């Protein structure tokens, strides 16, 4: 594939292809991942730990789709090559316009039941006043057993007076409610 574009943001469309592109370099590793440069890490062990790595094939930090800014995939043939199941993948990665393959079509391949969950919420739960994220937290573990979709609220939009703490010495980040965060994402 001939890939060279003047806009660096277009590189984000290659994220689902990282496992395939770096297949040789990944030999001997259990997981491969994708991330953004605008993250400040705290305790990433909240997300990536022995328990989660033993139980899940994909670990991500949103509950409504794969978080392209922080996602880890088991290093096996299935997840390395899932990107090639994206419809018209060659034309999408060679088109100049970014199309967010990581959080869009690839996310739908990793988590095929998210569409069903959206429909359950839209047609049933929202009329009962049940928040979409509550429905996701209930149904994701049932419908996506091998994927940890957990919302960490790492892309804040702090309001005046809120205090967020980044403790460099201890490698920890605490939001204004006192919750520990694995990282902060500056959008």
What do these predicted regions represent?
Residues 69-77:
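Short glycine- and hydrophobic/aromatic-rich loop-to-beta-strand nucleating segment
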């Amino acid at each position: 594939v001939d890939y060279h574009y003047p806009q660096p943001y277009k590189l984000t469309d290659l994220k689902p292809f990282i496992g395939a592109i770096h297949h040789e370099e990944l030999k001997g590793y259990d997981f491969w991942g994708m991330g953004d440069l605008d993250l400040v890490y705290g305790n990433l062990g909240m997300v990536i730990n022995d328990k989660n790595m033993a139980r899940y094939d994909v670990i991500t930090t949103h509950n409504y789709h794969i978080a392209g800014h922080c996602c880890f995939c088991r290093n096996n043939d299935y997840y390395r090559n899932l990107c090639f199941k994206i419809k018209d993948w060659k034309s999408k990665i060679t088109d100049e316009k970014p199309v967010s393959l990581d959080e869009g079509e690839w996310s739908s391949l990793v988590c095929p039941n998210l569409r069903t969950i959206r429909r359950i919420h839209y047609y049933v739960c929202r009329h009962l006043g049940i928040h979409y994220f509550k429905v996701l937290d209930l149904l994701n573990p049932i419908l996506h057993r091998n994927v940890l979709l957990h919302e960490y609220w790492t892309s804040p939009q702090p309001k005046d007076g809120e205090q967020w703490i980044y403790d460099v010495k201890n490698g920890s980040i605490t939001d204004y409610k006192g919750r520990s965060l694995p990282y902060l994402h500056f959008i």
